[in-house]
Amino acid sequence: MSKMTRHDAQLYELKKKIEELKKIRGRGTELISLYIPAGYDLSKVMQQLREEYSTAQNIKSKTTRKNVLGALERAMQHLKLYKQTPENGLALFVGNVSEIEGNTDIRLWAIIPPEPLNVRLYRCDQTFVTEPLEEMLRVKDAYGLITVEKNEATIGLLRGKRIELLDELTSNVPGKTRAGGQSARRYERIREQETHEFMKRIGEHANRAFLPLLEKGELKGIIIGGPGPTKEEFVEGEYLHHELKKKILGVVDISYHGEYGLRELVEKASDILRDHEVIREKKLVNEFLKHVVKDTGLATYGEREVRRALEIGAVDVLLISEGYNKVRVRVKCNHCGWEELKTMSEEEYEVYRKKITKCPKCGSQNLTIEKWDVAEELIKMAEEAGSDVEIISLDTEEGQQFYRAFGGLGAILRFKI
């Protein structure tokens, strides 16, 4: 798997874990979040946890005290598994997740993030602290987008696979006149002045939008488009800040303005952005659709079909929508050995878990229920098979189509099966 797509897969897995953690609520302040930065001394963390354990023995509520002490014990046990802090640091989330009052179900999530952690934090609260990890999901690299014509302008950003509309401007530049002589020349001067003022206003708005990103090192380039020569006049004039002018990657002919114009600008600038993820995603989804429509046998979709293709090493690129939320559930009776394996949504799982209270074969209530994320399982299978993985966003038309028409799971194949 290429470095880029592996990182995408790691971020996708992180996003799913964050979503799971954010749903959990403690009955008291009993959920522990622990962030250990890369390179930090684990013995110091253990010392802090022992001090917290001593303090927690003074908690007045018997239930909360029991749950906090249990969570701290579990965290300390887990840290003993590490000789040193993992390369990118470590985030631990521990606490009682039982929904039944009085019951204890201490669970632990250990996350080695895809990027170095630079935060050291210990927090005991009713919710887990996920903001430092969420910051890793925020796409930093951005491209400035400007569409310009005589009477209208749009300013936007391409950030990851999302096109954001930041600003829309209109002008009072009058149209051309048929009058002759001095009236025409005076009218033309007024028109030129109005155009100049409008261009200045576009530049000011663009400077406000893009300079902060440039200062943070997030602005990778600017693309400018429009239907006529106005865009070239804007580029050649002294309207944009000189540091932003250095970031102009290209000027493109487009027909539309507004939000649709921004989308057209990105589409028409595909050569400039050929390595950008939104262009790569569009090409991959269109390639997948082409194989499906032409029935070439080099595309498949649906969990069972994709799983089989991965098992025999037939997958070239695994496509997973960020909206895909299926889980795999295995229920086993520890008395008679009956077993059931099903795939369902998270919502269906909540209903299923409450309904299956005893074995349908022998009636025993001694059941073991396992649940795991289908997407994470398939990504690991793809890695083992040497397949690429592409996470398809819901921010493009192609991504929406892939999710709605194919359930958000498909594959481009190396060979027919």
Swiss-Prot record:
Superkingdom classification of source: Archaea
Key words, A-Z: Cytoplasm, Protein biosynthesis
Xref: SMART domains: eRF1_1
Cellular component, GO, one term: cytoplasm
Localization of this protein: Cytoplasm
GO molecular function, one term: translation release factor activity, codon specific
Pfam families: eRF1_1, eRF1_2, eRF1_3
Main location: cytoplasm
Family: Belongs to the eukaryotic release factor 1 family.
Free-text function comment from the UniProt entry: Directs the termination of nascent peptide synthesis (translation) in response to the termination codons UAA, UAG and UGA.
Quaternary state and interactors: Heterodimer of two subunits, one of which binds GTP.
HAMAP family: Rel_fact_arch_1
Protein name, as recorded: Peptide chain release factor subunit 1
Gene: prf1
